[in-house]
From Swiss-Prot:
GO terms for molecular function: FMN binding. InterPro entries: Flavoprotein-like_sf (IPR029039), RNR_Ib_NrdI_bac (IPR020852), RNR_NrdI (IPR004465). This is Protein NrdI. Belongs to the NrdI family. Probably involved in ribonucleotide reductase function. Transmembrane segments: none annotated. The gene is nrdI. Disulfide bonds: none annotated. It comes from Photorhabdus laumondii subsp. laumondii (strain DSM 15139 / CIP 105565 / TT01) (Photorhabdus luminescens subsp. laumondii). The lineage of its organism: Bacteria, Pseudomonadati, Pseudomonadota, Gammaproteobacteria, Enterobacterales. Pfam families: Flavodoxin_NdrI. One of its GO terms (biological process) is protein modification process. It comes from the Bacteria.
Amino acid sequence: MNINPLIYFSSSSSNSHRFVQKLEIPAFRIPINQSDSPLNITSPYILLTPSYGGGSTKGAVPPQVIRFLNIAENRAFIRGVIAAGNTNFGEAYGIAGRIISEKCRIPLLYRFELLGTEEDVQRVRQGIQRFWQHDSLENM
């Protein structure tokens, strides 16, 4: 089965990076530093992002993700979002995913806490496979 790459952001703490590595699927990381070359996407993808801001909507989406999505071509190819968050923030748990979902009019596919569990890894891996299988069947 052909799976489109996962696009993700992970800060220098690398929590999201470690989660993505466990998925064992093709993935590209959005650069941390503004001085790095931007990531330009030319095919459909799912975005995985952490949520920032300590429970506030202000600053919830990492600025690197905002810059990435402000590139029209990158925004055009987004098909879904997965969010990492902290359940201590209650209603704001994984809020970056909800914000991106609403602004880009795409589904929020999954939320997981902090580093995620093995169950989260399995659910995300299987969910991504089903998502792309369904997408490819619709485009036949």
